[in-house]
Amino acid sequence: MKFFVDSANCEDIQELQNLGLVDGVTTNPSLILQSGRNILDVIQEICSLVEGPVSAEVAATDFDTMMKEAAVLAKIANNICIKLPITLDGLKACKALSEQELKTNLTLCFSATQALLAAKAGATFVSPFIGRIDDCGTNGIDLLHEIRTIYDNYGFATQILAASIRTTTHVKEAALSGADVATVPPKVLKSLAAHPLTDKGLQTFLTDWAKTGQKIA
């Protein structure tokens, strides 16, 4: 499973990139707001930091304006992935952009039927929002399993990009479901490496090593 960083903070992205953990980046209007920067500037910088897909979201809701905004975003870099909402206009724009061989990410997916339409529209990625589904009292991970089954049944090439990831358990369950990608906030991504038994075991080894009086380098 690939890891995308769900952030518009270039310092966080660079830190994770240096660790070799970044396969791509996703942004959205809320993350752009948090960055306090111009969208074109921040997306351009992110694209210079990572080689993988960088999702940049249109702000329009009608087809014509979506296409105009997509054209502006696509010019930023070759690794831009145009992010669109799963609406009828968004699906239409996705189909048109796919025919131009541009990468697309259909977002705000909350049902398997929406994911089916995303695949039919030729989306590169579909983004089911796991955490937000959990907030409604339904298991968001179940949606990942449903989409995986549908896509496998029909051989769709659209990749499942698990989004709205809140916890390390979400990441684990997304991996078990067969999701192709998980887009993860920096804090959660870094916490995947943490375990109290690892810390305890390392401390024991370091204490014993100190007693040997040896050096390796």
UniProtKB/Swiss-Prot annotation:
SUPFAM superfamilies: Aldolase. Pfam families: TAL_FSA. It is found in: Cytoplasm. The keyword Thylakoid does not apply. It catalyses: D-sedoheptulose 7-phosphate + D-glyceraldehyde 3-phosphate = D-erythrose 4-phosphate + beta-D-fructose 6-phosphate. The active site is at K83. Its EC number is 2.2.1.2. GO terms for biological process: carbohydrate metabolic process; pentose-phosphate shunt. Transaldolase is important for the balance of metabolites in the pentose-phosphate pathway. This is Probable transaldolase. The lineage of its organism: Bacteria, Pseudomonadati, Pseudomonadota, Alphaproteobacteria, Hyphomicrobiales.
